[in-house]
């Protein structure tokens, strides 16, 4: 059974006040501020396995996993040992190292791409991939999908998901920038289509395909909540290359999470370029993009498309990423265990909400899950517009009641949660006990 955690958050409150004096909003990424759920964000002191400990000593069962990278759980021995060994050799060289070669060899072998280039974040990866696509094709326009989030490069902050979801929902149907500071001129170079609408994508490519350098997409959406592609939509994605456009899969979130070949391998997709992040750094800052040699050889110094980075291929990140992938590859049962746990979590959440009379629709694939607080049949939430109908107020109340019982869920209705290999059956039972209590209170049946 879960127990009510101590209500005080004195240390987090004090740190948040200090942070707001020196950092915009008191955080270094907006969703961490708890703006959509209320209350004080928890400042974390340490993390081990499936648990965080905040500055007030509260132990929290973690379903964020640093927003996806911690697929093995926090402080995994193999990752810790690899980083410690790398640290003994130095933190940054500004020169090539064996670690980046070994990780590149592993990524290419597991995913089937010919070449890979490491950068420092998912945003850098998608930004660089789009520049490469434009350089390779000689075209200007890109196509993205409403609610897909590809980082915060200007040209991609158009009808974006993630922390922009609430504001962007107000301009549904308009291809407008999702952030102040993004010039309309940039936004006009981004053509927006509805995710999971193959007819709309086909019509757009028929009309504008000759101008399109690339179509970028999340093979499984995670930042509008989890949205799973239909077979018809996947087929339409393959056809965009008939117009000479490149197909770019943003696997920053799904890469090595849904399978060793990511979502593209799981779904049978063969994009021209793939972007990665999160898991390939084992919890340290990283990004990468890769693809077939013909395209990747356009990247400097081999080709004319410039991209560089002082800390790209950082030896600590390379060591952590390589250790993570080695563990995943050495134990093929990990992915099956992750999926079983997450399916049971989804089923348990549905049952808890139903018992309390609370509307809930859960989307789940592999170890990714979103509990949409709305009345919709299972599997019917497939688009940005579908997700945007969720009751964010009900979610906020539920989130706080889960947090009060020591369950650390993503503090946004429009995010995926992530299950790790460190989660146990006992953790699952504790989570579902908490969910039954939270939904009973929300539905007035407690």
UniProtKB/Swiss-Prot annotation:
It is found in: Cytoplasm. It catalyses: (S)-4-amino-5-oxopentanoate = 5-aminolevulinate. PROSITE patterns: AA_TRANSFER_CLASS_3. Its EC number is 5.4.3.8. It is an enzyme of class 5 (isomerase). Pathway: Porphyrin-containing compound metabolism; protoporphyrin-IX biosynthesis; 5-aminolevulinate from L-glutamyl-tRNA(Glu): step 2/2. InterPro entries: 4pyrrol_synth_GluAld_NH2Trfase (IPR004639), Aminotrans_3 (IPR005814), Aminotrans_3_PPA_site (IPR049704), PyrdxlP-dep_Trfase (IPR015424), PyrdxlP-dep_Trfase_major (IPR015421), PyrdxlP-dep_Trfase_small (IPR015422). Its cofactor is pyridoxal 5'-phosphate. Keywords: Cytoplasm, Isomerase, Porphyrin biosynthesis, Pyridoxal phosphate. GO terms for biological process: protoporphyrinogen IX biosynthetic process. GO terms for cellular component: cytoplasm. The keyword Ion transport does not apply. The modification N6-(pyridoxal phosphate)lysine is found at residue 278. Transmembrane segments: none annotated. GO terms for molecular function: glutamate-1-semialdehyde 2,1-aminomutase activity; pyridoxal phosphate binding; transaminase activity. Disulfide bonds: none annotated. PANTHER family: GLUTAMATE-1-SEMIALDEHYDE 2,1-AMINOMUTASE (PTHR43713), GLUTAMATE-1-SEMIALDEHYDE 2,1-AMINOMUTASE 1, CHLOROPLASTIC-RELATED (PTHR43713:SF3). Homodimer. Belongs to the class-III pyridoxal-phosphate-dependent aminotransferase family. HemL subfamily. This is Glutamate-1-semialdehyde 2,1-aminomutase. It comes from Deinococcus geothermalis (strain DSM 11300 / CIP 105573 / AG-3a).
């Amino acid at each position: 059974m879960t127990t009510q955690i101590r209500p005080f958050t004195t240390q987090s409150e004090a740190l948040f006040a200090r942070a707001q004096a020196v950092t915009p909003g008191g955080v270094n990424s907006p969703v961490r501020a708890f703006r959509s759920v209320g209350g004080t964000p928890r400042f974390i002191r340490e993390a081990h396995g499936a648990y965080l400990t905040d500055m007030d000593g509260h132990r929290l069962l973690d379903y964020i996993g640093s927003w996806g990278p911690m697929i093995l759980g926090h402080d995994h021995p193999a990752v810790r040992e690899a980083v410690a060994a790398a640290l003994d050799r130095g933190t940054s060289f500004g020169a090539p190292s064996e670690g980046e070669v070994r990780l590149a060899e592993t990524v290419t072998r597991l995913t089937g791409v010919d070449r890979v280039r490491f950068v420092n974040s998912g945003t850098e990866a998608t930004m660089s991939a789009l520049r490469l696509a434009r350089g390779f094709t000689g075209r200007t326009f890109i196509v993205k999908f409403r609610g897909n989030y590809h980082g915060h490069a200007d040209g991609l902050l158009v009808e974006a998901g993630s922390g922009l979801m609430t504001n962007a929902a107000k301009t549904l149907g308009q291809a407008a920038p999702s952030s102040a500071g993004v010039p309309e001129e940039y936004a006009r170079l981004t053509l927006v289509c509805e995710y999971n609408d193959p007819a709309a994508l086909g019509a757009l490519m028929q009309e504008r395909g000759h101008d399109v350098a690339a179509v970028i997409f999340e093979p499984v959406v995670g930042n509008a909540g989890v949205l799973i592609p239909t077979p018809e939509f996947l087929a339409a994605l393959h056809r965009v290359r008939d117009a000479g456009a490149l197909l770019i899969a943003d696997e920053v979130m799904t890469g090595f999470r849904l399978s060793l070949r990511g979502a593209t391998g799981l779904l049978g997709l063969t994009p021209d370029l793939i972007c990665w992040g999160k898991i390939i750094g084992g919890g340290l800052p990283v990004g990468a993009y890769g693809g077939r040699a013909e395209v990747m050889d356009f990247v400097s110094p081999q080709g004319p498309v410039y991209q560089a980075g002082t800390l790209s291929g950082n030896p600590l990140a390379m060591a952590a990423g390589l250790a993570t992938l080695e563990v995943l590859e050495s134990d093929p049962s990990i992915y099956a265990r992750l999926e079983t746990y997450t399916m049971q979590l989804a089923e348990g959440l549905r049952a808890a909400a139903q018992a309390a009379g609370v509307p809930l629709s859960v989307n789940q694939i592999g170890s990714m899950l979103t509990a949409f607080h709305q009345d919709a049949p299972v599997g019917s939430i497939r688009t940005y517009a579908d997700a945007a109908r969720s009751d964010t107020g009900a979610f906020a109340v539920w989130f706080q009641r889960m947090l009060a019982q020591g369950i650390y869920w993503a503090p946004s209705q429009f995010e995926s949660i992530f299950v790790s290999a460190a989660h146990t059956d006992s953790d699952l039972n504790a989570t579902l006990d908490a969910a039954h209590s939270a939904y009973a209170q929300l539905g007035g049946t407690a």
